[in-house]
Amino acid sequence: MAITLQALSEAHIPTILEACADWPELAQYGPPYWRPRSSAELRRKIADTAGPQPARAYSFVLADSDGRLVGETSIHAIDWRSRVAQVGICIWRPSDRGQGYGAAGSRTVIDWAVGHLGLHRLEAWILAGNSASLGLFRNLGFVEEGRLTQRYLVGSQYMDMLVLARITGA
């Protein structure tokens, strides 16, 4: 699966807003701090990535072999002293999920985080019911380390958040 990471930029905003139009469908898989996509929120992410270095977060879009944007990934909540960060991945459209984009994008951003940033530990916080993401990160060598009971409200139901981690050796 060929996937390219591109630093999030102003040119990507219209495509992202269109792809993320069904926010309730997307948000059910996301972390507690997710907000509906807006131009302002995306510009903040661009500024975080392009701002003073080293940044506390880096955001990328995923492009398939034809250049079509299919999702986003990030290295965020970076603790530079301990060289620890969280990794996130989102494939926007249901029709693009299960095609290998998430695995290819995650491998690429993890390799970049270890090789370029020198991060020692990566974490993935995933809803307990998100079996696709749990399987993806377990296949990438992440191990479940904890459960945050009733951490995230989905609709009217509280869900557990699982914390998975991988020691990179960097």
Q: How should these model regions be labeled?
A:
Residues D22-E25, G51:
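Short helix-loop boundary/capping segments at the starts of domains
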